[in-house]
Amino acid sequence: MSDTPFGDADHPRPAPIHPDAVLPPPMSSQSADNDPTEALNEAWTNILTKVSKPNRAWLSNTTPVTMHSSTAMVAVPNEFARDRLESKMRYELEELLSDHFHKAIHLAITIDPDLELALGAPDHEDEEEEVPPAQFVPKVTVGVTEPSARPTTTIDDDEGNRLNPKYTFDSFVIGASNRFAHAAAVAVAEAPGKSYNPLLIYGGSGLGKTHLLHAIGRYVMSYYDNVKVKYVSTEELTNDFINAIGTNRTTEFRRSYRDVDVLLVDDIQFLQSKIQTQEEFFHTFNTLHNAQKQIVMTSDRPPKLLEALEPRLRSRFEWGLLTDIQPPDLETRIAILRRKVAAEKITVEPDVLEFIASRIQTNIRELEGALIRVTAFASLNQQPVDISLAEVVLKDLIPEGRETPVTPERIIAETADYFDISADDLLGTSRAQTLVTARQIAMYLCRELTDLSLPKIGAEFGGKDHTTVMHADRKIRALMGEQRQIFNQVSEITNRIKQY
């Protein structure tokens, strides 16, 4: 890749969104009483009466999506329409939106190819064609952009990328709880360094933040030539830095993190209290941001709540766009389960999926875990997957009454007690089969029953690497559908934990 920034004179990078940009006067009471989507619909209708007739024709092809803090999200049918709004109308629209809401509003533009072009849309055959920056050229030319419509190419998941092929925009289920985060991720993937920089997605564990992070990386690499994407967890970033210091290879470390076009950092909250790593990341952030290279991060909370993070880093994390992901609503949970059974090629009746979705309301990971338990139980007993079976399985998973939060300490203690071993042995390194099985089940239950990320679970198990936790999770999931003993062990330990 060239060192030339993504933005250029013809494609200026939008000004970053900053909390200090919000003006004192409050939003009008009329708009404030509506939900964000209704408020934006009202504003958009008002704006259509104030723009020129040619611009009104262009705006008739747009659809207001939602409001998030000081950002208004609108959808257009294709790249040409987006470029038109970006280059010719952005500042006028932002000014009109700001006037309407009585505060500074940033316009976010995403592409929805399902939108039909209005019959009266202006003819743009004579419009001057804009050429993308030389260093960021698409592999093919397409008229309509949508993540699923992009060309599919082979991505080398080398050490610098390690992007999960299952985590794509196509496989991400969109609902009210994540719609804005998804739209922001797509916007960043389509125009790295131009839309929002940095983009920080925050929310509880198991809600899809990592999925979007990988989807951005895979999308960029599939569509653009010679682009360098680096995905890393904060734990790995810290370990890389410590190893670089110990081996006098800090120059190589800096090159590996700064000579990239898109840097994806997972679980940035774990940077807290790591003073030297924060210092190094501060300079890496500045280098990439000044070169208009894209930075995307995830966190379990917004920057202002990362109290053990240096203020200058918290401030920089707020330069771009902050967007959260909430637990999915019932409709989204059902859609997630439908997608899961289709991917796994298993048959589950709709009423069973609705029943499972109604019982699991916390996060996607636990939702999919419940489905796995139900289908595994049915497979072991050669029974059809029906509601009565689901009730039996989920009764132990979610007992009636008020439930206290599950902690890794409780999971470790109950698992050790079940296998009649000490907690120290369970957390140790012995490869004795009983200890390995107990350790893997405990890791699986931590993954399913808590909000802890993979690196955090690894830390609870004596500093195990996150890949060890991932392997344990996958292995136990598979064995539950194959070995009755494993299924019973997991179910009995879960029941003990839930009845604590």
UniProtKB/Swiss-Prot annotation:
Residues of the region (Domain III, AAA+ region) are: 162-378
Q: Provide the taxonomic classification.
A: Bacteria, Bacillati, Actinomycetota, Actinomycetes, Propionibacteriales
Among Pfam families, the record links this protein to: Bac_DnaA (PF00308), Bac_DnaA_C (PF08299)
Q: Where is this region: Domain IV, binds dsDNA?
A: 379-500
Q: Where is this region: Domain I, interacts with DnaA modulators?
A: 1-103
Q: Where is this gene product found? A: Cytoplasm
Quote the PANTHER family the UniProt record gives. CHROMOSOMAL REPLICATION INITIATOR PROTEIN DNAA
Where is there biased composition of kind Pro residues?
Answer: 14-27
User: To which species is this protein native?
Assistant: Cutibacterium acnes (strain DSM 16379 / KPA171202) (Propionibacterium acnes)
Q: Where does ATP bind?
A: G206, G208, K209, T210
Region entry Domain II: which residue ranges? 103-161
Q: How does it assemble?
A: Oligomerizes as a right-handed, spiral filament on DNA at oriC.
| HAMAP family (UniProt xref) | DnaA_bact (MF_00377)
Q: Name one GO cellular component term.
A: cytoplasm
Q: Name the chain's protein.
A: Chromosomal replication initiator protein DnaA
Q: What is known of its domains?
A: Domain I is involved in oligomerization and binding regulators, domain II is flexibile and of varying length in different bacteria, domain III forms the AAA+ region, while domain IV binds dsDNA.
For this protein, the record's SUPFAM superfamilies field holds: P-loop containing nucleoside triphosphate hydrolases (SSF52540), TrpR-like (SSF48295)
Q: Which family does it belong to?
A: Belongs to the DnaA family.
